[in-house]
């Protein structure tokens, strides 16, 4: 009886630990995905993800018009709608072309821009992006200059997904002859864990972006890549945060989760976040052998030098560089003494962009069972040993005659 009770207590405790990370993050939403709302023009891509919750709506607006960008707009209304003035959006002055109505329902808005891809020659195989001499860098790929495919055929209302795929048609080296860069978008209507590596845990308050470089011919035999992004915040700035875990079940040898969280000193409401596991993959299979650690570099203020155009200007307006905080950061992919990009000519990196608290990872049932066995076996042996010793000490021998 004591043994059984001990096992039950151990298993119950581990289940509580495993489920603690998901408590309060099980909100569901009614999600829809729409391509170019209000327009039949397929020369540009605007993908609108609308996620309606209990008394609020999160709007995600993805576009490859200018610099590839995702807008996140949170409203405290279940009926808020995205309005697009297509004439103005496609004009040289797109400011004000995007808005969410009713405007007074908007309580938070942010944006993430994907500006450039860096390629450098890692001559010493150190994967040290920031420490590499400038002479080993190739001219960066400016994503605003890419030619982007029509994404309409990739929009899937059932899987809540879409693909934005483009290539550099002006590169004299012809690196994109059979290659492309893609942003795969996946939305979620409830909490869960993604099916593809790195198996990120998500909630209904976020969407996943997967950045892929596939089939692009490297400009050197030992090339590595890095991605430059820009964040936009009205109040406050983004803060880097590293979250460590003892569990590497889904990403072997990788124990770190990185987060960029918006921080405002006087804000009373939640804000946006970007979250990812510190890992990328060098093959489509996402196998352990092709796992690539990735490195985040410090945020850099960008207001005075920001010139890129995107749908962020269409929403935030003319005073974007003056009234908002813009910060750039880089993520590089690769590990010292590891394989270079040319092994498979493939790179995949995934992240979550969302509103509120970033998802908290939790132990799977398999890990909980393993921990229960590992922790419970010594306790079980101790209990059995104690019972046996006690039984022997109190055992009455019938042939024993006490000495007077």
From Swiss-Prot:
| GO biological processes | protein localization to lysosome; protein stabilization
State which residues carry a glycan (glycosylated): 85, 124, 128, 142, 152, 156, 163, 168, 178, 189, 205, 221, 266, 303, 330
InterPro entries in the record:
NCU-G1 (IPR029382)
So which stretches are on the Cytoplasmic side? 386-404
Motif Lysosomal targeting motif: positions: 400-404
One Pfam family of this chain:
NCU-G1
In which broad location class does this protein mainly occur, judging by the first location in its UniProt entry? membrane
UniProt superkingdom: Eukaryota
- Looking at the UniProt entry, the stretches that span the membrane are 365-385
Q: Does the keyword Oxidoreductase apply?
A: no
Q: Which UniProt keywords apply?
A: Glycoprotein, Lysosome, Membrane, Signal, Transmembrane, Transmembrane helix
Localization per Swiss-Prot or TrEMBL? Lysosome membrane
Q: Which residues lie on this side of the membrane: Lumenal?
A: 25-364
The membrane topology term of the UniProt record is: Single-pass type I membrane protein
Keyword hit for Disulfide bond: no
Q: Which segments of the protein form a coiled coil according to its record?
A: none
What are the annotated GO cellular component locations?
A: lysosomal membrane; lysosome; membrane
Signal peptide boundaries? 1-24
**Subunit details:** Interacts (via lumenal domain) with lysosomal protein MFSD1; the interaction starts while both proteins are still in the endoplasmic reticulum and is required for stabilization of MFSD1 in lysosomes but has no direct effect on its targeting to lysosomes or transporter activity.
Family the UniProt entry places it in: Belongs to the GLMP family.
Full protein name: Glycosylated lysosomal membrane protein B
Which species is listed as the source?
Xenopus laevis (African clawed frog)
Identify the gene encoding this protein: glmp-b
């Amino acid at each position: 009886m004591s043994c059984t009770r001990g096992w039950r207590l151990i298993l119950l405790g581990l289940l509580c630990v495993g489920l603690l990370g998901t408590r309060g993050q099980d909100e569901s939403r009614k999600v829809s995905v729409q391509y170019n709302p209000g327009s039949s023009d397929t020369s540009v891509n605007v993908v609108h993800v609308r996620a309606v919750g209990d008394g609020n709506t999160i709007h995600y607006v993805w576009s490859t018009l200018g610099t590839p960008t995702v807008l996140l707009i949170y409203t405290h209304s279940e009926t808020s709608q995205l309005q697009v003035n297509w004439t103005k959006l496609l004009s040289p002055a797109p400011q004000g072309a995007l808005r969410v109505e009713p405007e007074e329902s908007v309580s938070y808005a942010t944006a993430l821009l994907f500006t450039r891809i860096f390629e450098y020659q890692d001559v010493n195989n150190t994967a040290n992006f920031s420490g590499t001499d400038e002479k080993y860098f190739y001219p960066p790929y400016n994503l605003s200059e890419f030619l982007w495919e029509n994404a309409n055929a990739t929009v899937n209302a059932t899987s809540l997904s879409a693909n934005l795929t483009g290539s550099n048609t002006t590169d004299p080296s012809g690196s994109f002859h059979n290659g492309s860069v893609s942003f795969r978008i996946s939305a979620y209507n409830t909490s869960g864990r993604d099916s593809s590596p790195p198996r990120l845990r998500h909630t209904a308050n976020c969407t996943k972006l997967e950045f892929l470089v596939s089939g692009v011919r490297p400009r050197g035999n030992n090339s590595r890549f890095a991605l430059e992004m820009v964040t936009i915040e009205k109040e406050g700035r983004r803060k880097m945060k590293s979250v460590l875990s003892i569990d590497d079940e889904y990403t072997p040898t990788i124990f770190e989760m990185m987060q960029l969280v918006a921080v405002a000193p006087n804000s009373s409401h939640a804000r946006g976040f970007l979250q990812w596991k510190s890992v990328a993959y060098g093959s489509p299979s996402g196998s352990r052998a092709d796992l690539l650690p990735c490195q985040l570099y410090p945020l850099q203020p960008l207001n005075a030098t920001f010139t890129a155009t995107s749908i962020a200007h269409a929403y935030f307006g003319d005073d974007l560089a003056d009234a908002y905080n813009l910060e750039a950061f880089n993520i590089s992919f690769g590990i010292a003494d590891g394989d270079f990009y040319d092994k498979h000519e493939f790179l995949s990196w995934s992240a979550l962009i969302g509103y509120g608290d970033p998802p908290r990872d939790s132990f799977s049932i398999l890990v909980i069972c393993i921990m229960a066995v590992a922790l419970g076996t010594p306790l079980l042996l101790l209990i059995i040993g104690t019972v046996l010793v006690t039984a022997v000490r109190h055992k009455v021998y019938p042939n024993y005659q006490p000495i007077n």
